[in-house]
Amino acid sequence: MLKTIKSWILGKRDQETSHLTSHRPSTSLNSYSAPTPKRTRQTAMKSTQGTRDSARQSTNLNPKQQKQAKKIVDQLTKIDSLGHHTNVPQRQRIEMLIRRLYREEIGEEAAQIVELRLWSLEESPEAAQILTMEPKSRKVLITMKLERWIRTLLRGKCDNLKMFQSRYQEVMPFLQQNKMETVMMEEAWNLSVHLIQDIPA
């Protein structure tokens, strides 16, 4: 049963991700430019097949299971829903930064900085929980949190530093209650503020 739900969730997420990215034009950030590897294309084809298989499997779930699976899908795609921007060039720059965060050394460095800062936090159960995770899983979780904060700070039409700072003010009450998330937000700020500063006046 769990395997069926998991397959349905992954298929649904692949389908939504494909919808978000299918019409996105190619772009570049600094000198980064990576062609799509053959292996990636093969993976995409397998993912499409998996989506069709998952759709068939979802019919075997009872209403309660489907409701539970949909709730999990909504949680998994919450990050994607934060990424809708009215400024298309800005959105392209954000997506390129996030791809670099997952694929290049910038992501490794950011995760290491966050990890070191988490070690310095005292009496933070949230930080302690992350630090007890297996290193690979910890890095993935930190990267996902950084992505979420980048999308939160740059959501909507945020094309100048003043608007960027107003986003920060909006989340201040939450950050005052969670030191771990404050560390994540500050690193996301450092990673993404140049996207605002680089926009021509």
From Swiss-Prot:
Any matching Pfam family: Paramyxo_C
Entries under InterPro entries matching the protein: Paramyxo_C
Polar residues composition bias: residue spans: 18-34, 42-66
Domain of life: Viruses
UniProt entry keywords in alphabetical sequence: Host-virus interaction, Inhibition of host innate immune response by virus, Inhibition of host interferon signaling pathway by virus, Inhibition of host STAT1 by virus, Inhibition of host STAT2 by virus, Interferon antiviral system evasion, Viral immunoevasion
Residue ranges of the region described as Disordered: 15-70
BP GO annotations: symbiont-mediated suppression of host innate immune response; symbiont-mediated suppression of host JAK-STAT cascade via inhibition of STAT1 activity; symbiont-mediated suppression of host JAK-STAT cascade via inhibition of STAT2 activity; symbiont-mediated suppression of host type I interferon-mediated signaling pathway
Entry's family note: Belongs to the respirovirus protein C family.
Name listed for the protein in its UniProt record: Protein C
